[in-house]
Design a protein with these regions (language model features):
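One-carbon transfer enzymes
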Residues: 1-183
Length: 183
């Protein structure tokens, strides 16, 4: 299965690392453009493995979509994406596109999802892997994982102790479900 990974930061890098450990065929990685001298960890991981890296300033450019089409993806994985990506990108892959979001959608769509779970005093939160459509964090849900929010939890503890590692595992589980025809 030809996979395109769109993401950033340590989360995106960990997803890439785990996909490659499972011998998945990652044909390209998209990350945000470099800012300053520091490169994104996902970009660094992809370059180290010889995987092409694309860094468009916008996904609304026709040339960006043409380059994406030429990759002929079977599956696109969105692993920590903060850009607005046109729906045509999600519809192109033969097996679709999946996206990670650190909340139990439809709750807390958009940015700062973990913060809102804490601010609202939620007793539970979690993550969602879904099939994105044209909205902001909308589309059919593939799977969700739930966690309890303790009285001493912070956005950092929820993310680094639970939602980050569970999110990587949930993406891998989703890829397997798709490959097995169960999703």
């Amino acid at each position: 299965m030809r996979i395109v990974l769109i993401g950033q930061a340590a989360f995106g890098a960990k997803v890439l690392e785990n996909l490659l450990e499972r011998d998945e065929q990652v044909v390209a990685v998209y990350t945000p453009p470099d800012r300053g001298s520091r490169q994104d960890p996902l970009k660094e991981a992809a370059v180290a493995k010889g995987i092409p890296v694309l860094q468009p300033s916008t996904y609304k450019d026709d040339q960006v979509f043409t380059e994406y089409q030429e990759l002929e993806p079977d599956l696109t994985i969105l692993a920590f994406v903060t850009d607005i990506i046109p729906e045509q990108f999600f519809k192109l892959p033969s097996s679709g596109s999946i996206c990670y979001h650190p909340s139990l959608l439809p709750l807390h769509r958009g940015s700062s999802a973990i913060n809102w779970a804490v601010i609202k005093g939620r007793k539970k939160t979690g993550l969602t892997i879904f099939w994105p459509d044209g909205g902001i964090d909308t589309g059919p849900i593939l799977l969700q994982k739930e966690i309890e929010v303790g009285p001493d939890d912070t956005t950092g503890s929820l993310y680094f102790n639970y939602l980050f590692p569970m999110g990587v595992d949930a993406i891998l589980e989703s890829v397997e479900l798709i490959k097995e025809g169960k999703a």
